[in-house]
Amino acid sequence: MKKSGKSIQMALALLAAGTLLLNGCSAAKPAEKKSIRIGVTLYRGDDAFINNIRSSLEEKAKEYEQQTGIKVNLEIMDPKGNQNTQNSQVDRFLSLEYDAICVNMVDRSAASYVINKAMDVGTPVVFFNREPVEEDMKRWEHLYYVGEDARESAVLQGEILVDAYQENPGSLDLNEDGTVGYVMLEGERSHQDSLIRTEWSVQTMRDGDIPLEKLTGGSANWDRSQAAALMEQWIRQFGDAIEVV
């Protein structure tokens, strides 16, 4: 397994654009490759963040073509949040002998299906944004994961609030009751990055001696309308007691 901490858009695009293939994952030597075919399956195409990745990937594929003269045939498919549909898309890519596939898993625990199929035909797989379990990623040398460092981003979030509190406690303790009331709005309860960010953002604030009081929390599943609905509900319930979200 190889894991990258680079920006997910940039790293995914570079990996998907053939860097892996031209460094030993493909049977053909770099000089022999005139084009590469990459199949991409997203967990849900209507997700704003995933759409940004899609746009970045398409842009970087074009840049790669211009820089190397190697044609990048990129096919991006949307399983609309259905794991069975995603499995069928993976089957299609492999049956058509794509050079590599990039998979944003609908269900990260179902990665073994993708891995088994890819290993059977020797096609490298780049997982992104949703990391399969460690046991799956260790099964084959041509499995890769590209994603953010969730703990690092969570610690940075917490440190911003710690710095603000240390400079002026009243900037967070708005009602001056000696505690900082917060609500935790999560992306998706089963997403590993969401779980890590939740844990370490709070831990960093506690380590920085912010007197925290959790009022409530909930998951909006990366959906803006769900997040807005939760916040409206919490504001009605807790009002000015909410000092940090």
Regions found by a protein language model. Name each.
Residues 6-14:
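Sec-dependent signal peptide recognition
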Residues 2-6, 25-245:
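A residue-level marker of the well-folded mature domains of exported/periplasmic proteins
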Residues 16, 20-21:
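Hydrophobic core
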